[in-house]
């Protein structure tokens, strides 16, 4: 599986995209298996398709272990992890955590995910000097005890 970002650059992996690939190959009759292995730039991933009445209902994927060490994410920072750390983005301090789940991610909690000036703030985070390989940015709003609203740049 080759994954490309919106700007045309390569991505190592995308959990949602690989699930779509699993559904696609089953729906198109390219396989009738319910356990698939797919090669990605982040390694070989295993998928399990939950099929009922010939239709894929859900796809589960083994993403591997998350990587929290800054040098493995990568994040230009010292320490054992980069969790709940302040960074400056466009003159504002944000508390962020970073992880690699096949490609770099940066997670920050916000009061209102839909109110963000996404076209402005997204690229500023993605291309921040902290992320030498850039990063996927998740802006997470806690809606209630059971619901999160997440916008991904």
Located regions from the model:
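Active-site proximal loop and beta-alpha junction motif in alpha/beta enzyme cores
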Residues: 1-13, 18-153
């Amino acid at each position: 599986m080759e994954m490309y970002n919106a700007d045309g650059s390569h991505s190592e992996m995308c959990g949602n995209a690989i699930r779509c690939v699993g559904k696609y190959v089953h729906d198109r009759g390219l396989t009738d298996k319910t356990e698939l292995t797919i090669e990605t730039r982040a390694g070989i991933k295993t998928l399990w398709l939950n099929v009922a009445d010939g239709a894929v209902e859900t796809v589960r994927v083994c993403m591997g272990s998350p990587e929290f060490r800054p040098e493995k994410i990568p994040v230009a920072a010292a320490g054992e992890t980069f969790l709940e750390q302040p960074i400056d983005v466009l003159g504002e301090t944000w508390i962020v955590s970073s992880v690699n789940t096949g490609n770099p991610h940066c997670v920050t909690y916000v009061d209102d995910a839909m109110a963000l000036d996404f076209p402005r703030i997204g690229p500023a985070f993605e291309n921040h000097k902290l992320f030498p390989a850039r990063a996927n940015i998740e802006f997470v709003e806690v809606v209630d005890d059971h619901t999160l609203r997440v916008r991904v740049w």
